[in-house]
Every structure is written in C-alpha cells, then in structure tokens.
Regions:
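Non-catalytic, solvent-exposed segments at the cell envelope interface
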Residues: 1-481, 485-487, 491-492
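Alpha-helical structural elements
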Residues: 86, 504-507
Length: 529
C-alpha cells in the first residue's frame, strides 16, 4: 500500500507475497490430506469423526481446517489471476450515473479499458460512453422491445447496454458491443456508481484536478459532476476539444487524478477506511465485478460481487427503475409495501404496492419526454420481478403519458403494461411486471399488484412446522428504497421465530420496515396444529 496501488513497486511486492502464500497453502493442503488418510483410514470412520462427535459438531476439526485453507487458497488464486501474474488481463471499468438510474446502477457515463500485467496497469484508455460506437450503429445488436419503443432507439447502444438487472448478462452485453467497435475482447467488467467514486475522493481529501484550485472535497466534486459548477480542464488524451469544458470534462480529469493518487501510495489511516468503503459498496451492489474467466468466476459468484439475480425456490422480489435519458431519479423517491397472507396447502395471497413521490414544483404545462429538464417529470420504465411461483397476477393498466415520444409520433396503443415469464439471460423462471410510468412534478403515483403464490413457495419442515422465506434483491445505485414487508400467519398458527428481528409483531402479522441497503432475506418459522 505504501508503494501505491498497482505501481511497479506494489506489483513486485504483491507478486512475491502471493507466490509465497500460494506455495504455503498448497503445502498445508497436501499435509491435511495426508493427515486425513492417516486418521480416517480407508473405511471413512476413525479418529476425525470421533473428535467431531465428542465436540458436538457435524464437521471434524480436519474438515474445518481444510475448508478454511481451501477458501484462503481460492482467494489467493483469485488475486494472482486477476492481477495478471499468469498472463495479462484486460478489463473494462464502467462509471454509472445513479441519478439517471438503470438496472445495474445507472447510465454509463464513461468507460475505461485497462490491462493488468503482473500487477502493473498498462494500456489505460478512457472512453466517453457516447463515442464508443457511432451512427448508423450497424454493428450494434437489436434492442429489447421495450427499449425500442420507449428509448426510441433501433439499436442497443454501448451507453445503454446495461439494461439487464442480472449484471453478468449486462456485463456480457457491454463487452460484446465494445468488442464489435474496438476489436478488443475483455476478461471482465467492473462497474461503480459515481457516488462511490465521490466517496473515494472524500476519503482521500487531497485529490486535485487541473480545473480546480486546491484539493477537492466530496461536496465540491459532486457539484462539478452534477454540472452545478462551470469547469474547464484538460480531459482525456486524444480529445478534439482541448481545453475541454463541462461535467464530462471534469469526470475525465477526476478519473486520471484518482488513478495517479492511488499510484502515489495510500497512507496507513486511509487504508482501513478505503477497504471498508470498498466492502460496503460491494455489499450495497454499487460496486460490481463480473469476470469471464472460469478460474475467476466462482469467487465473484459466491460473494455476490457480480450483482447476479439469484434463483431461489421460495418467494422473491426485486423492483427496478429505468430512467430515460436526461431524466434524473433524484427528484423522485420510491417506496414499496409487500403483504403476504400465508396459508398451508393452498396458494398464498400476495399484495405489492409501489409508490413514487416527485418533489418538484407542480407544473403549469404538459411535460415532454424530449424535454430534459430534470425537475419536470420522472420518466421511468419500472420492472417488478416476481418468483416462478407467482400466478393469477392482477395489475392495472399503465397508460402512456401524453408527452411520450410514442404518442407524439402518432402511435395509438396507449397501455404500456408488460408481463413476461423469462426464459434466459439470467432471469429464467422470474415473472416480470413492468410499464412506462411517468411521475409528474408535485404528484404521487401508486402501482398496486396482486397475485398468488403456489403452495410450493412455503417449505414444510415436518411436525407441523413451516418456513416462509422471502429474498428481496436491491437495485444497484438505489440506496433509499423504503420498504414494508408484512407476513400474516395462518389462523391458529404459532410463531416460532422470525429473522431479521421484526419491527413489530401484532396478532398474526409479522412486520418489517426499513431502508433497503443490500439484498435481504426475511424468514418466518411457524407451527400449525
């Protein structure tokens, strides 16, 4: 760390230590294997199992030791391969603007391609996301149908290729478009929200850019990112307009300044805080990593770093917003309430209510999709993902707003409601309910959904005990989702436990309220007569 992250000195020291650690762990695993053969014998019983029973555990001390060593070996091997000590690895980094929200965290503002060769960054190239591909976009794939009609785009552009909430699929789509236009295939895709990048600026406290006197605070950097301060700077190498102006110019200068700051070394007091920040933003899915190499993929899947939609055999919910270009989410807040009436041996009744509030001043005119003033309307294609057990879904029409481009061009189909049972791209089995929702300034819009869950969504445990489990997955880039989850037990049921600790238990209702900052699992264990 003192040499600077990804500097030549750091790379040399990291390579030496990782290589030595690999050797130590390999030796330890071999010795554990030999000890197991000695203790367990050919019959599979022996001293190890006796120790496990004596200590009251299901795993023997050798099992636990071997699992710990294997986990450590996997982590070391991940770093060894990721940093390019086996061969050079090329990655694409995406800066996603969470204010113009998209399923994986936000509109892609810029992309950086870099290669890690034995721990050293080489071949660093920064792209404006709007300049990776070019009209008439003949190399770009066809977009999904709802993107065609509501973004008014005949091709899936690089900057919009992250429209799948399953980040591994979005990463593959982004990498494919990038390869078609640049001829460069990458080994993985990393993404971070601009808010996370600003947090790093605030953490260091001494980052500077060419167009601002002195070090940047997080607040000042955010004003530049939002275009609230005029900026004139240097921009990325190869820019046609130098010096450059505006918030994109600031983004580029800030990127190179942060790279250089990391290379200069990380002071001891900052190291722990930086590691904690990275861990927290990965937990919140504001920092995502998906790698295509089979040697690297297992760890990011197991840790959840790759923002994958997780297939489950119980209840599931994910709410996703897709803001249209130029329309910022920061003016609109989203909350939702989910109520489930649990039953035994018959379908469960579920009610979901989405609520959007626009904090702008009420309008005296009709807002238009083509008007990019952020405070007028929130133009959003919402998606709700339900489990495969969801049936008999009731949803209201989602009429197109009179200011949409589709109506402006003379199309008469006015209902945008969409229901799809997915079969691929990481969403297999999930049911999607969505629509093109426009929230006018100063208004509140509610979307009610009602459906049934097949009895298989409830897990019987025997002796009259049942487990209801709900996985709620957070949308990357959205840290302010206010939720209510309420589970109503069957009549005469006895509550045996609930996790996490409920906000309240009232009669047959078990209720949680809070702000969704990460994926969350809610469980209710009960017994019936």
């Amino acid at each position: 760390w003192e040499h600077g992250v990804l500097s030549p000195a750091f790379a040399q020291q990291a390579g030496e230590r990782l290589g030595a650690t690999r050797g130590v762990l390999d030796t330890a695993l071999r010795e554990v294997g030999a000890l197991r053969l000695l203790l367990e014998g050919a019959g599979g019983g022996g001293m190890g199992r006796l120790l496990a029973r004596a200590l009251g555990g299901g795993l023997s001390p050798l099992d636990r030791l071997e699992a710990a060593l294997t986990s450590a070996r996997l982590g070391v091997e991940f770093l060894w391969v990721f940093l390019g000590y086996d061969r050079p690895r090329t990655y694409l980094f995406l800066a996603q603007n969470q204010n113009e929200i998209r399923p994986t965290g936000g509109f892609i503002g810029y992309a950086a391609r870099f290669t890690l060769d034995r721990g050293v960054v080489t071949d660093l190239v920064l792209h404006d996301s709007t300049e990776v591909d070019a009209p008439p976009y003949e190399r770009n794939p066809q977009p999904p149908d709802f993107i065609y009609w509501y973004l008014w785009m005949e091709r899936l552009l690089f900057r919009d290729a992250n429209w799948n909430p399953h980040f591994p699929s979005s990463a593959a789509a982004v990498a494919e478009v990038y390869a078609r236009w640049t001829g460069v295939s990458v080994d993985g895709v990393l993404a971070a929200t601009k808010a996370t990048i600003l947090d790093v600026v605030g953490l260091f406290g001494d980052v500077s850019v060419p167009g601002h006197p002195g070090p940047l605070t997080r607040a000042v950097a955010e004003e530049y990112v939002e275009g609230q301060r005029p900026y004139t700077g240097r921009g990325r190498p190869g820019r046609s307009d130098t010096p450059c102006t505006g918030k994109r110019c600031f983004d580029e200068d800030l990127f190179f300044s942060l790279v250089e700051r990391l290379r200069q070394g990380v002071p001891l007091p900052v190291r722990g805080a930086l590691a904690a920040l990275v861990g927290e933003q990965a937990r919140r899915k504001n920092l995502l990593v998906h790698l295509f190499d089979p040697a690297l993929a297992p760890l990011v899947w197991e840790t959840g770093w790759n923002g994958a939609v997780r297939p489950v055999d119980h209840d599931y919910l994910m709410v996703v917003d897709n803001a249209l270009p130029g329309h910022e989410r920061k003016w609109a807040s989203r909350s939702w309430e989910y109520r489930v009436h649990v039953a035994v041996d018959r379908p469960l009744e579920a009610d979901l209510r989405l609520r959007y509030i626009h904090r702008g001043a009420p309008l005296q005119e009709v807002c238009r999709q083509a008007d990019w003033r952020a405070s007028t309307c929130y133009w959003n294609f919402f998606q709700v993902f339900l489990p495969r057990w969801a049936t008999e879904i009731e949803a209201p029409p989602v009429p197109l707003h009179e200011g949409t481009e589709r109506l402006a061009w003379g199309y008469t189909e006015g209902d945008s409601l969409r229901m799809v049972r997915h079969r691929g791209e990481g969403l297999t089995g999930l049911v999607e309910v969505g629509g093109y929702l426009t929230v006018e300034a100063g208004t509140v819009v509610t979307v009610p959904l009602r459906y049934r869950l097949a009895p298989e969504a409830l897990r019987p445990l025997g002796e009259g005990r049942y487990l209801y489990r709900l996985l709620v997955q957070k949308q990357p880039g959205v840290d302010d989702d206010h939720y209510t989850v309420a589970v109503r037990l069957p009549e005469d049921a006895t509550l045996l436990g609930a996790t996490p600790s409920p906000t309240r238990v009232a009669g047959r209702w078990v209720v949680w309220r809070g702000t969704l900052t990460a994926d969350a699992t809610f469980e209710v264990l009960f017994r019936t007569p």
